[in-house]
UniProtKB/Swiss-Prot annotation:
GO MF annotations, alphabetized: NAD binding; oxidoreductase activity, acting on NAD(P)H, quinone or similar compound as acceptor; quinone binding
Signal peptide limits: none
Cell compartments where the protein resides: Cellular thylakoid membrane
Known EC number: 7.1.1.-
Gene3D superfamilies: Cytochrome-c3 Hydrogenase, chain B
Species per Swiss-Prot/TrEMBL record: Synechococcus sp. (strain CC9902)
Catalysed transformations (reactions): a plastoquinone + NADH + (n+1) H(+)(in) = a plastoquinol + NAD(+) + n H(+)(out); a plastoquinone + NADPH + (n+1) H(+)(in) = a plastoquinol + NADP(+) + n H(+)(out)
GO cellular component: plasma membrane-derived thylakoid membrane
Gene coding for it: ndhH
Transmembrane segments: none
Name of the protein in its database record: NAD(P)H-quinone oxidoreductase subunit H
Function: NDH-1 shuttles electrons from an unknown electron donor, via FMN and iron-sulfur (Fe-S) centers, to quinones in the respiratory and/or the photosynthetic chain. The immediate electron acceptor for the enzyme in this species is believed to be plastoquinone. Couples the redox reaction to proton translocation, and thus conserves the redox energy in a proton gradient. Cyanobacterial NDH-1 also plays a role in inorganic carbon-concentration.
Self-association state and partner proteins as the record states: NDH-1 can be composed of about 15 different subunits; different subcomplexes with different compositions have been identified which probably have different functions.
Length: 394
């Protein structure tokens, strides 16, 4: 008796670019054999706005408001790296107080970034409730940003060459401490809701596993790299700003799956709270109201009027010329390594301004880890990468 052989023709399916689980205008051309993913081709570029070319036709001060439109969840990180590049090329010193203020803003942005990743990721795998909780927490961070910069989500326009645009307002540090005290139990609440939830764990454990060597070879960074057993964090490696002043640990895991990436980001929020608390206590000059009172009482010769107690080294003129030379500078954002390659030619605008977006590099491994998985796993694996298409397409 002859046995009939079942044959299935491969089917090509388009996910996106308008699918709600695509996290922006990403299109995936997926080849399926039944429910198994045979191949996947990401199609990007739908959100290309020519950011690098815009940067090459603007002065640094003019370009800073643009950059938060690339990644609306990491606006402060892009502002920081865009001012760090000309600072290093022109050897402009940054006062200690300004560096602490920058760290406060960056760590608040890291928490906000991870929260905005957490809600949609859980919604992708079927847990709807935490999606509403994360916006409650982000609202507190928005309030802190609004008090310091005047804007909430994007377009903060706060970082400047040599420091920041303005000192912290009165009472800001106390409000930041209140946020830390309020948010710490909320992370425990997330852990109770999610981490040991058997449905959630069965859904994502062992999914989208990336080996250590693959993570390095594909040039992954951030939680994608650290979840695969590589404790690499640019805050420890490059010693930029004043991160060496604080006591904190790099969050990393060995498994390399979606669950490991989730755990890394949860732990990073805890570490960011540790850094925020220490920065609030250790900032040179203390709260702005105390610093201003000390300057007023002690006069011009006051220690509080010294360089390290300023919020900016020297306000850079609109005619500031980027010196001849080239350099690459980078920092650790919530998604990984973001960097700028800057080439100056002694002009007010740069000759070349190349932006390295972390999620752009991290997205490249998606076809490699999707093969062999089920079609229902595509959303969970893509969600664990943390992609925002504004910075991928630039």
């Amino acid at each position: 008796m002859t046995q009939l052989e079942t044959r299935t023709e491969p089917m090509v399916v388009n996910f996106g670019p308008h699918h709600p689980s695509m996290h922006g205008v990403l299109r995936l051309v997926v080849t399926l054999d039944g429910e198994d993913v045979v191949d996947c081709e990401p199609v990007i570029g739908y959100l290309h706005r020519g950011m690098e070319k815009i940067a090459e036709n603007r002065t640094n001060v003019m370009f800073v408001p643009y950059v938060s439109r690339m990644d609306y969840a990491a606006g402060m990180f892009y502002e920081a790296v865009v001012v760090n590049a000309p600072e290093k090329l022109a050897n402009i010193p940054v006062p200690k107080r300004a560096s602490y203020i920058r760290v406060l803003m960056l760590e608040l942005n890291r928490i906000a970034n991870h929260l905005l990743w957490l809600g949609p990721f859980l919604a992708d795998v079927g847990a709807q409730t935490p999606f509403f909780y994360i916006f409650r927490e982000r609202e507190m961070i928005y309030d802190l940003w609004e008090a310091a910069t005047g804007q909430r989500l994007i377009n903060n326009n706060y970082f400047r060459i040599g420091g920041v645009a303005a000192d912290l307002p009165w009472g800001w540090l106390e409000k930041c401490r209140d946020f830390c005290d309020w948010f710490a139990p909320k992370i425990d609440e997330y852990e109770k809701l999610i981490t040991n939830n058997p449905i959630f764990r069965r859904r994502i454990e062992g999914l989208g596993t990336i080996e250590t060597k693959d993570a390095i070879n594909w040039s992954l960074s951030g939680p994608m790299l650290r979840a695969s057993g590589v404790p690499w964090d640019l805050r420890k490696v490059d010693h930029y700003e004043c991160y060496d002043d604080f006591d904190w640990q790099v969050a990393w895991e060995k498994e390399g799956d979606c669950f490991a990436r989730y755990r890394v980001r949860i732990e990073e929020m805890r570490q960011s709270l540790k850094i925020l608390r220490q920065a609030c206590d250790m900032i040179p000059g203390g709260p702005t109201e105390n610093l201003e009172a000390k300057r007023l009482n002690e006069g011009k010769g006051s220690e509080a009027a010294g360089f390290d107690f300023q919020y900016v080294a020297k306000k850079v003129a609109p005619t500031f010329k980027i010196p001849n030379g080239e350099l690459y500078t980078r920092l650790e954002s919530g998604k990984g390594e973001i960097g700028v390659f800057l080439q100056g030619n002694n002009d007010v605008t740069p000759w070349r301004f190349k932006i390295r977006a972390a999620d752009s590099n991290n997205l490249q491994i998606l076809p490699h880890i999707l093969k062999g998985h089920k079609v229902a796993d595509i959303m969970a694996i893509l969600g664990s990468i943390d992609v925002i298409m504004g910075s991928v397409d630039r």
